[in-house]
UniProtKB/Swiss-Prot annotation:
Removes the formyl group from the N-terminal Met of newly synthesized proteins. Requires at least a dipeptide for an efficient rate of reaction. N-terminal L-methionine is a prerequisite for activity but the enzyme has broad specificity at other positions. Its cofactor is Fe(2+). This is Peptide deformylase. Keywords: Hydrolase, Iron, Metal-binding, Protein biosynthesis. The lineage of its organism: Bacteria, Bacillati, Bacillota, Clostridia, Thermoanaerobacterales. Binds 1 Fe(2+) ion.
Length: 152
């Protein structure tokens, strides 16, 4: 396992649309493990592959309910709306209020290539939306109001 340096705002990979994963190889499994190690080392609740410099459609999320790994995730259903404060490991020292769907259903593949569908609400729904935005080259600051800079 390895902890990678998180890519920060200004790096062009964060503006790219990440490439779909066509085959789940041992390298993809290793990527998921390294992403989780990195997320935990940085005390994050989610991480997308582009945040460690890899243009692949993979995310890891853990909001305190256990690690979720998703390959080629997509949001298939949304409902409601709520505004809350977000931050991002790739935009250190910055927070802002972002309006997101209150509930989402996310579909993707697990590390075994099995399709999984996850209904989510609250922080988990927000984390999924935030990380999937990363896969589409979108940073939270592009959607945020009341942006505040905090000490690093």
């Amino acid at each position: 396992m390895a902890v990678y340096k998180v890519v920060e705002i200004g790096d062009p990979i964060l503006k790219e649309i990440a490439k779909p994963i066509k085959e789940i190889t041992p390298n993809i499994i290793k990527l998921l493990e390294n992403m989780a190690d990195t997320m935990y080392a940085y005390n994050g609740v989610g991480l997308a592959a582009p945040q460690i410099g890899v243009s692949k459609r993979a995310i890891v999320v853990d909001v305190g309910e256990g690690l979720i790994e998703l390959i080629n995730p997509e949001i298939i259903e949304v409902s409601g709306e709520e505004k809350d404060i977000e931050g991002c490991l790739s935009v250190p020292g910055v927070q802002g209020e972002v309006v997101r769907a209150k509930k989402v259903t996310v579909k993707g593949l697990n590390r075994y290539g099995e399709e999984i569908v996850i209904p989510a609400e609250g922080l988990l729904a927000r984390a999924f939306q935030h990380e999937i935005d990363h896969l589409n080259g979108i940073l939270f600051v592009e959607k945020a109001d009341n942006i505040v800079r905090k000490g690093r």
